[in-house]
Structures are given as structure tokens and as C-alpha cells.
């Protein structure tokens, strides 16, 4: 029995032009009715965060079969918009949201906010006027995951060994080591981003589609169909085979 393909797009990080390229690749392969899951981290670092959010809102409004998941960067942006907070205890390094490592300032600049070297309180005051409330609510309401058959789409990963109903939303946005280093099979093939790699990886129990758009590397789009996994480029599908566990 064949099942319809499901497409996924890795971390976007404000790279609007790259997002458009990924959407063209998907449309070429699956048409305008393609089911697409966006794995979160829509904002920060790149210059087009506003355009990315607008594109996804408009696509859903047109009836596209698009599911947009939340990422930790999206959650940090909502936190800033709610309270002006630039520090979050979940950021273990302690670096602020508006600093270069997390990359919040380009997000504000995409909304026309200038004077980015000002105090965060002044930036927050401008942001509350410049950022449409519907953008904040869109990000706030994003789901943490999507289960589609034997595929689990999520931004960062899951806590191994826990059933889905016991998974923590913060883990799904933030987890790394405990998930990435566990080679055991999960009940599903987990499709995630969050932890940047040079190119997409299939690790047998998980597929990582964060190919580093936050560091000016290309966004990865992939297709999952009848147990197979392919990445997409301008020429079509490229098989993404599991890496031998001995190399993990």
C-alpha cells in the first residue's frame, strides 16, 4: 500500500530567498498540494524573518497543506515580544537573544527597526509597535510536533524512552545530547532540525534536516515516501541513506 509523500523543510532562520528555493523544489516534485512540515526556527540570524513568517501565514490562509512547528528561536522571539526579556534560563551559555550568537537583531531589522545598538528596553518599545500582533500569535500557537504514520516531525528531538504523550514541549524545542547520542530505535523515525550539520543526515532512528541556514548554508527540503527518504535539489530527488552505525 502506497502512502502520499510528506515533505519537510529544515531550519529557515530568516533566509527568505532560500525558503522560496526550497518551496520551488517541493512544488516541482509534489505540486502545489504537497503536504509540507516546517521544522521550526523560522527567525533569527537571517535578514528575512518577517518575510518568512508572512509567507507561511499566507500559505496556510490559501489552504496549503502546511504544518509549521515551533523552534527554540521562535519561542525566544515570542518571549522578547511578551516581556522584553533577552535572557532565558534555557540558553545554557547565558548569551542574550539580541546578541550575535542567537541573532535576534536581524529579526528586529526585518520589521524596519533601526538603532540596533540601543538598550534592549528601547528595542522592545519599538518592536511592540512594529511587529504585527498576528505574527506573535502565529508563533505562540505553533505546535511542538506532528505525527504522520511512522514519522514524528519535531524541531529538536525527543527524550528517548518516553511515550509521546509524556514528551515535554521544551525538550522538543531544545534537546540535543540525550537525543542525538542515543542510537536505539524510537517508535517512529524522528525528523528534526535544531542541531546544525554540514548536510542532512539519516542516522537510522532519526533524520536531521538542519543543514545550517543560520550560518548561510542552504536550507534542506526532503521528501518521505513509502519508507524512503530523499533530499531535494534543482535536479530532483537524491536518496538519503542511513549512515552505518559504526560511524555514529
Task: Report the location of each language-model feature.
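N-terminal active-site segment of His-dependent metallophosphoesterases
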Residues: 1-55
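A general structural motif
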Residues: 3, 31-34, 63-65, 149, ...
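Residue-level marker for buried hydrophobic side chains located in beta-strands
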Residues: 8, 36-38, 68-69, 152, ...
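Active-site environment of divalent metal-dependent phosphoester hydrolases
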Residues: 13-17, 44-47, 73-78, 160-161, ...
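Short, glycine/charged-enriched secondary-structure capping and boundary segments
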Residues: 21-24, 51-54, 82-85, 167-168, ...
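Intrinsically disordered, low-complexity terminal extensions
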Residues: 37, 230, 240, 244-248
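Active-site neighborhood of divalent metal-dependent phosphoester bond hydrolases
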Residues: 46-141
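Acidic, His/Gly-enriched loop-helix segments that form or flank divalent-metal centers
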Residues: 102, 106-208, 212-218, 224-240
Amino acid at each position: 500500500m502506497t502512502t502520499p509523500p510528506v515533505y519537510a523543510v529544515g531550519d529557515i532562520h530568516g533566509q527568505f530567498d532560500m525558503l522560496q528555493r526550497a518551496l520551488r523544489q517541493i512544488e516541482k516534485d509534489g505540486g502545489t498540494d504537497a503536504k509540507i512540515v516546517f521544522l521550526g526556527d523560522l527567525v533569527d540570524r537571517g535578514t528575512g524573518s518577517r518575510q518568512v513568517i508572512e509567507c507561511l501565514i499566507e500559505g496556510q490562509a490559501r489552504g496549503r497543506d502546511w504544518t509549521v512547528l515551533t523552534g527554540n528561536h521562535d519561542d525566544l522571539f515570542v518571549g522578547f515580544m511578551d516581556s522584553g526579556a533577552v535572557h532565558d534560563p534555557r540558553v545554557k551559555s547565558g548569551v542574550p537573544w539580541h546578541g550575535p550568537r542567537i541573532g535576534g537583531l536581524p529579526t528586529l531589522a526585518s520589521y524596519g527597526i533601526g538603532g540596533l545598538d540601543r538598550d534592549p528596553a528601547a528595542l522592545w518599545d519599538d518592536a511592540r509597535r512594529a511587529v504585527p500582533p498576528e505574527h506573535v500569535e502565529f508563533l505562540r500557537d505553533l505546535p511542538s510536533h506532528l505525527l504522520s504514520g511512522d514519522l514524528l516531525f519535531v524541531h529538536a528531538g525527543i527524550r528517548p524512552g518516553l511515550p509521546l504523550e509524556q514528551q515535554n514541549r521544551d525538550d522538543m524545542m531544545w534537546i540535543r545530547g540525550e537525543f542525538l547520542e542515543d542510537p536505539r530505535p524510537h517508535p517512529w523515525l524522528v525528523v528534526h532540525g535544531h542541531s546544525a550539520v554540514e548536510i542532512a543526515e539519516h542516522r537510522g532512528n532519526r533524520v536531521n534536516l538542519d543543514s545550517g541556514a543560520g550560518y548561510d548554508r542552504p536550507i534542506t527540503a526532503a521528501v518521505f515516501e513509502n519508507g524512503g527518504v530523499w533530499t531535494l535539489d534543482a535536479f530532483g530527488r537524491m536518496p538519503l541513506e542511513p549512515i552505518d552505525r559504526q560511524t555514529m
